Amino acid sequence: MKLQVNGTAHEVAVSLTVRGLLDQMGFGEKPVVVELNQRALFPREHASTELSDGDVLEIVQISAGG
């Protein structure tokens, strides 16, 4: 399955949820904002949202600064 993540092509061998992709990419439980095909997802949707071939994602890690 081919995905575009933050403007870069990614290929994954199995179907995944957004949560599974975040885990594979090393985000774990870090706070992130995810946009899937130009639609922002609530964090509660990450585990139940299945990815499809050709999906476009933007993932932004939230960090605090001072």
Range-by-range predicted roles:
Residues 1-65:
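Ubiquitin-like/PB1-type beta-grasp interaction modules and other compact soluble beta-rich domains
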